[in-house]
Amino acid sequence: MSHFSKIKTALKDLDLLKQSLNDLAIKWYVKDNIVKGYKDQITFANIVIPQNNNYDIGFVWNGVEYQLVADLQFWQQPWSVEFFLNKLTQRYAYNSILKMANDTGFHPVNETVKENGLIKLTLQRWRP
């Protein structure tokens, strides 16, 4: 028997979530807002990520954060659930830092991605 699982995240900003999914080349939509599961089960999601097997995954707002919602038995992404969330969270943090930096007058001057995936970002404030 299969069912939807909801996994907590630290993702709170919908625009940053969308941008981070785009950065990872993950196709998503908000058109129908329905995640399809096993035996025609459905649940609401703010963002839907279609899968080739027709068992979608998505993100739903719980009032505090966006939770990943999926029927994990039918997970069909290039990464495991844990790795997917780690990559997405890293990208979300990166985009969040850039947004906050830009809002406070900073801009990136150097970025290095290490072999282990660690991103080193150097910011600078422009002072006229």
From Swiss-Prot:
Coiled coil: none annotated. InterPro entries: Uncharacterised_Ycf35. Keywords: Chloroplast, Plastid. The keyword Isomerase does not apply. Signal peptide: none annotated. One of its GO terms (cellular component) is chloroplast. It is found in: Plastid, Chloroplast. Belongs to the ycf35 family. PANTHER family: YCF35 (PTHR39638:SF2). This is Uncharacterized protein ycf35. It comes from Guillardia theta (Cryptophyte). The lineage of its organism: Eukaryota, Cryptophyceae, Pyrenomonadales, Geminigeraceae, Guillardia.
